[in-house]
Each structure stands twice: as structure tokens, then as C-alpha cells.
């Protein structure tokens, strides 16, 4: 249930309204927006008389929410959520670009790539330390050593770091990471999601291979219901009948999610296509669709990459792509954030 408050509501009136709802054993969440203040009620609201609530002096109107996700629902939180990542604002009206290799391999590789993507205009650095691979014989990542190398690259470039967590037992390794990424395979690892919800560290949540948008939002709800509101959604392609690309990028998800939720939205054209030559056109399409951030894989030597070289751009290719992203983002009214 959502209660929209009148603009002239007094603080005491709002406090009395919140206290009045305690008798129904529901949780209340007061959201102070730009245009209006809203109280979201989460729990069993069937016993609450809407007319009785509507009669309160400070209440503008009351709405029942049919969707199962509440915290992530735009009706609960009309204004866009802006997530601060070490000074970078995701969802704040400027486009962020997260770039870097699929896997952290060596000190030279990650630092060389980090410097290159920053020079091209990337605002955050990505790199996998713990890698979920289809084959048990494929490179699984450097683990904690990989995170240490990312931190070293951050010291040199100043770029906030984004890396994926696979298992709850590794959570302590991510204490100094700026954004924890939850991959497609773990989107419904609810134990992991709840644990991440008990921190305030930003979480980049990727859509599962065969997941609906509602399932994605319900996974976000798991994190948010534990208290962490810093959730970034990511469209990275879904599995369809088409074998020509690694996945099928669902660009319609971007504007549709923006209607349904206040959370910022990232698009990953690298995993969506699996083909380096398709990354640039799909990145530009994602900017046109209105995404808040792009996540692009870049490797200093893709032909010899330890994982996903086929979808990785060279630094030179990435620099050319960024020129087009910059021009298009300005035209679309969400300009690329400037690297200091």
C-alpha cells in the first residue's frame, strides 16, 4: 500500500500516521521525494481500511500495490535512486561507463588495461577475480589475489572497482571493493542476496539467463528488504532460440524497467552478444534506450585473454567506441560523466 502525503503535511501529523499503522504490524517506509512525500507499507495490509487512511488530514491519496516487489517499485519511490560510488553518481543524470577485462590475469594486464580505459573516458574499472565458468576446466580466476590487483589498479588510476562475488564464504574479500557484482547465475541465490542486503555496499545485480523482469526485481527486493537500497540493475542478454549471438540483448528492458522501478539500469553489450564487433553498435543502442551505465569488456590483448577474448575490445577499439558514446549521450540528454 502507498500513502501519498499532502505537500503541506505537518511533521507531527505524519508521525501520528506512522504510529497509527503500528497496530497492523506492517513496516513503514517514508520516502521524501522532490514533488511529494510517500509512505510505503509492506506486509499484510488487507486489514487496513483505505477510507480510514484517506480521511487523515495529511493524506492526499491511497493506492494498493499489486506488484509483489515493494521497495524496488517506482510507486513507492517516485524519484530516481542515485547511487554514489566513490563520488560517481549512477542514476544521477550522467552516463557512467564500467570497463575492463573479463578476468584479472596479471599485474601488468590489469594495470595496463585500467590506464587505457581511463584515458578513453571510462569512469569505473571492472575485472573478474572469482569467475563462474561453464566448464570446470576453464580458468576460475585469481580469487583474493585478483581483488588485490584491482585495488592496486584503483590506486594508480583512481577508478572505483567493480567485481563479481560467487559465494557467501568469500564476502570478507570484498570489504574494499566499491561495487559488488552478482552475476546472472547467482541472480536467484537468495542467501547471498540477503547477506549483501545487510551491508550498504552498492550491488550490481545482473539479470539471469532466463529470468523475467519481475524475477529480476524480486531479486533486487531480497537485497533491499534487508536494508541495502543501493541496487543497480543490469541487462546482459537472455537466452533465446537464436544461436548467432551468445545471448539476445533485451533493450526493451531498459525503458520498461524505468517505468516499473526507481533503480538505475546498466547494460552489458559484451556478454549480451559475445562478439566484439557487435559491442559498439549495441552499446550505442543501449545509450539511446536510456541506460544509466554501460559495462564493457576491454583487454589489452584479447587474442590471448584467459577468458572471453572473443567479446573483448582492444583499448584502441574501446577509445573509438567511447568517442561515439560521448557524442550520442550528449544528444540523448544524459552526457557521459567526465573523468577527473
Question: Where in this protein do the model-derived segments appear?
Answer:
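Glycine-rich, proline-tolerant flexible connector loops at the mouths of alpha/beta enzymes
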Residues: 126-144, 300-312
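N-terminal amphipathic alpha-helix/helix-capping segment at the start of soluble metabolic enzymes
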Residues: 67-98, 323, 330-340
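Catalytic alpha/beta core domains of metabolic enzymes, predominantly
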Residues: 85, 199-298
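Active-site mouth loops of central-metabolism enzymes
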Residues: 8, 95-112, 136-140, 160-164, ...
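Alpha-helix-loop-beta-strand connector modules within alpha/beta enzyme cores
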Residues: 139-163, 195-202, 251-266, 311-334
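N-terminal small/glycine-rich loop or linker at the start of catalytic domains
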Residues: 80-102, 131-136, 258-267
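Hydrophobic faces of well-ordered beta-strands that scaffold small-molecule active sites
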Residues: 96-101, 123-127, 161-163, 180-182, ...
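Catalytic beta/alpha-barrel core
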Residues: 6, 142, 158-169, 178-191, ...
Amino acid at each position: 500500500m502507498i500513502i501519498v502525503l499532502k505537500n503541506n503535511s505537518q511533521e507531527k501529523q505524519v508521525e501520528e500516521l506512522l504510529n497509527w499503522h503500528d497496530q497492523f504490524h506492517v513496516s513503514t517506509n517514508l520516502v521524501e521525494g522532490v514533488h511529494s512525500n510517500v509512505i510505503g507499507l509492506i506486509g499484510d495490509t488487507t486489514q487496513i481500511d483505505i477510507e480510514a487512511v484517506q480521511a487523515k488530514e495529511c493524506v492526499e491519496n491511497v493506492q494498493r500495490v499489486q506488484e509483489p516487489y515493494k521497495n524496488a517499485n517506482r510507486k513507492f519511490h517516485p524519484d530516481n535512486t542515485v547511487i554514489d560510488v566513490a563520488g560517481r553518481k549512477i542514476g544521477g543524470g550522467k552516463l557512467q561507463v564500467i570497463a575492463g577485462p573479463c578476468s584479472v590475469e596479471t599485474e601488468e594486464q590489469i594495470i595496463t588495461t585500467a590506464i587505457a580505459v581511463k584515458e578513453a573516458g571510462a569512469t569505473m574499472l571492472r575485472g573478474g577475480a572469482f569467475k563462474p565458468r561453464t566448464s570446470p576446466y576453464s580458468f576460475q580466476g585469481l580469487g583474493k589475489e585478483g581483488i588485490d590487483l584491482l585495488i592496486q589498479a584503483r590506486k594508480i588510476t583512481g577508478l572505483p572497482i567493480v567485481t563479481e562475488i560467487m559465494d557467501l564464504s568469500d564476502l570478507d574479500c570484498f570489504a574494499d571493493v566499491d561495487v559488488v557484482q552478482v552475476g546472472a547465475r547467482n541472480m536467484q541465490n537468495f542467501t547471498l542476496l540477503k547477506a549483501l542486503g545487510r551491508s550498504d555496499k552498492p550491488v550490481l545485480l545482473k539479470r539471469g539467463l532466463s529470468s523475467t523482469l519481475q524475477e529480476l526485481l524480486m531479486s533486487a527486493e531480497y537485497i533491499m528488504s534487508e536494508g541495502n537500497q543501493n541496487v543497480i540493475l543490469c541487462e546482459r542478454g537472455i537466452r533465446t532460440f537464436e544461436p548467432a549471438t551468445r545471448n539476445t540483448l533485451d533493450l526493451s528492458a531498459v525503458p520498461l524497467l524505468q517505468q516499473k522501478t526507481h533503480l538505475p539500469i546498466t547494460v552489458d553489450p559484451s556478454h549480451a552478444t559475445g562478439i566484439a564487433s557487435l559491442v559498439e553498435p549495441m552499446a550505442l543502442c543501449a545509450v539511446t534506450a536510456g541506460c544509466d551505465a554501460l559495462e564493457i569488456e576491454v583487454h589489452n590483448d584479447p587474442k590471448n585473454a584467459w577468458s572471453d577474448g572473443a567479446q573483448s575490445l582492444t583499448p584502441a577499439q574501446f577509445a573509438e567506441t567511447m568517442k561515439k558514446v560521448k557524442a550520442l549521450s550528449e544528444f540523448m540528454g544524459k552526457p557521459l560523466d567526465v573523468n577527473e
